[in-house]
Amino acid sequence: MPKQLKEIKDFLLTARRKDAKSVRIKKNPDNVTKFKVRCSKYLYTIVVKEKEKAEKLKQSLPPGLQVKELK
């Protein structure tokens, strides 16, 4: 069962952990973007409803992480 995070800061801290493997970004037609980070035990998700915040969050991801964009 995935864990849903509410705060962007918590998501960024989770993405910077050692056991974080990859991030998937899923964009819906109605300007809802979901970020999913795969860690060793859980899949952590966050839902961003604003396009500007989603772009900012995408640029804030750690550079060593594998990022895959889904449509």
Swiss-Prot record:
One Gene Ontology molecular-function label: structural constituent of ribosome
GO cellular component, one term: cytosolic large ribosomal subunit
Any matching Pfam family: Ribosomal_L38e
Annotated InterPro entries: Ribosomal_eL38, Ribosomal_eL38_sf
Domain of life: Eukaryota
Swiss-Prot/TrEMBL keywords: Ribonucleoprotein, Ribosomal protein
UniProt keyword Nucleotide-binding present: no
Any one of the GO BP annotations: translation
Family: Belongs to the eukaryotic ribosomal protein eL38 family.
Protein name per its UniProtKB record: Large ribosomal subunit protein eL38
